Amino acid sequence: KGEKENLIEIAAYGEGALPHICANGTGIWYQDYGIRLDSPAHVYRGDVSSAVLLYDAEYIWIHDLEITNKDDIDRQSVAGKTSGEARSEIAERYSAPHKMDRTGVSVVAQNSGTLHEITLQSLMIHDVDGNVYNKHMNNGGIYMTALKPDNEEQTGIARYHGVTVEDCCVWNVSRWGIAVGYSYQHARFAGAQLQEEWFLKYGHENIVLRNNYVKNAGGDGITPMYALRPLVEHNISDSCATEM
């Protein structure tokens, strides 16, 4: 963790190409919301491969990196085949229910209460071959979640206060392009009308999604969730839901 006046910074320096974090299915961690989700069909726990994982981290600024998490075995398996055979096999592979959940950047709040000032800026995230079905697992380009704490009474409700995702290019990812905020507290936000106090206690505040470009996401493009008046401006989402 950083501090308000002393942020942790992870970024490129010097000249030349951006540093490239290439996960290729490594960086595996176990995600568990600790509670079933809003649909019994939605997966709520399992292994996830993330190129970058920020777990209970705050006061952190990550910028100017290239990030990928490819399924190279799938790509190599269709080499040399006819276009029809290749298309058929690719379709079968991307829709396989057992396909690994993958993320470019995963951010997780769980055992540290409210997390503050997390900034992702000028990241080039592409070729993240995740599972198109597991929509609320950390699955896609950038995905931030809040999981049930081990001891909520002691550590507090897991939530975010101050998230900025800005100037990022995200392409060829699945399932999500950019998602901020799916939470184990989802049941508290099921009504048609919600009080501001619920967001201040159980949801997220000061969420900014600005100047991002998402192209060819397998599912959703850019989504804030359970956030009080998030600022979403000057983003472009192009050719999304390509695997739906």
Sequence positions of predicted segments:
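Right-handed parallel beta-helix/beta-spiral solenoid domain characteristic of secreted/periplasmic
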Residues: 2-98, 122-134
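Extracellular beta-strand solenoid repeats
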Residues: 9-11, 20, 53, 61, ...
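Right-handed parallel beta-helix
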Residues: 7, 14-16, 58-69, 91, ...
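Hydrophobic alpha-helical hairpins/lids featuring a short glycine-rich hinge
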Residues: 109-113
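Short, well-ordered amphipathic alpha-helices
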Residues: 1, 105-106, 121-122, 142-145
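C-terminal extensions
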Residues: 115, 137-148, 160
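Short glycine/acidic-rich loop motifs that flank beta-strands on beta-rich extracellular proteins
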Residues: 25, 31, 48-51, 71-78, ...
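Short flexible/disordered coil segments
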Residues: 82-94, 98-104, 194-196, 239-240, ...
